[in-house]
Amino acid sequence: MFSLPRVFTLSLVFVACASQLNIRQSTNTNAAINSILDTLDESIHHISPTILTLMANQTLSASTLGPQMTTLENAFTQADNDLAATAVSAGSTTVAPTNDDISITYSDIMQLVSTTLSGIIPSGDVPGFPTMVQTFDPIMAKTTLQLNITSPASLVLVHKMMADARQFFAAEGFTQTLSALGF
């Protein structure tokens, strides 16, 4: 039925075809992902106090908030681009930074953004804030989804940690971001 040369030839063909397949998650790129998120987290920790100071000093307006929102948008866009350029991570639950470390950092970022922006609508000082949200929301949602691609299942813990803070995103109109987070 099958001669030895045919079996050998078929085996070589199968090996050649199989060697072309790339393993989807071959390396742990958590360190690169964590570095990207640390940069984003640092940016958010600079932008948030500025926005909160504008509110506290009663100098919040479209002209003072606009540049801060642009800075937020740029920070998330850069993180999205950097995450997209990073190989999908095999991840790790034991080697630092772990999958949970990444999720905790991103959750911190999201909680800080949601709580920082939560006082803008009630203040009434920026009537154009919903328009700013319409611009920023898809950017933040895209970064969130890209994180979940580059670090698979990373949003599971973020979703749980955002259980309370999601109310602020809902009140501010961040529907795409909430959807990306699984709400």
Enumerate the language-model features and the residues they cover.
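A taxonomically broad motif for mature regions of secreted/extracellular
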Residues: 20-183
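Fungal secretory targeting signals
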Residues: 1-26
